[in-house]
Amino acid sequence: MRVPTIAYSTDLGSMYHGRIEEALKQNKVKALRGKVDLIFTSPPFPLVTKKRYGNETGEAYLKWLEGLAVILTDMLSPTGSIVLELGNAWEKNSPTMSTLPLEALLAFKRAANLHLCQHVICHNPARLPSPAAWVTINKLRLKDTYTHVWWMSKVERPKANSGNVLVPYSKDMLALLKRQSYNAGKRPSGHDVSATGFLTDRGGAISGNVLDFTSDADRVPSSLLKFAGTGWDTAYRNYCKAQDVETHPARMQIDLAAFFIKFLTTEGNLVMDPFAGSNTTGSAAEELGRKWLSIEAEERYVIGSKGRFGNFFTPQSGNPVGEKKEANHE
């Protein structure tokens, strides 16, 4: 098994090329134990068949993820959070869903004695229909349009500030703020709504736990608008094409990474992604002024991920991950 190496760095972070189990044994990484404010990652999904981005399958996936729980949690600061994005899974050759992602989550939580702070849904109606056999061919199931995001921590009240990810007010709320009145008093539910509790403009509304960052969504946090559009992914894809390497087939939405980085950390904090893929997490952290540490086992994805960083790089010796070199025409 290869020794993990630093593939590239910026002033704020480094990308390691290697498996997470080995990377955590490196002295520079071990020195960060107890100092990571947020681990945000999307482990390879527990698909029924092996994909080219290195996923485990079946029971092996559960044991693998469970085995990482303690060593990853040890990296967290006392008030740090670990956030896992887990997709849905289906039984092999069957239009029935697998409970493996939930079983793996529970095994991970129990192994590290974590608190489950909240369950968040990331909705993306633009996702391709899947599983294709049961959705588009046999038409027996509905299109899968969301992933689960599980926020956990070592303590019940980890560092968090929902004020950092406020969403725009609805038209009704804007009208209420303008007229400065509403129907206060008792509700059938038993709640007693005060006469002034909703009259203060706080700059936006508290985000719900169903996130939708698609182009037609009208309630994207204003602090994340700079991540909207396709520009972030276009630069990455163009770089991969120039380097003649394949793009990652299951890239994370940069808006999702940025949301949790803004929500759970402050500028200068340390963000870690142990399954970095195209290093969406690292690039979002860089843009938001957070320090970052990313780890990826597949060399081709490490090479391509450099395309997310533009001119942020600091000098590295040699050609550590086989990056395509420009021809010398002298």
Predicted regions, residues:
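Conserved phosphoryl-transfer catalytic core
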Residues: G310-N328
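Core catalytic lobe of class I
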Residues: M1-G304, N311-F312, H329
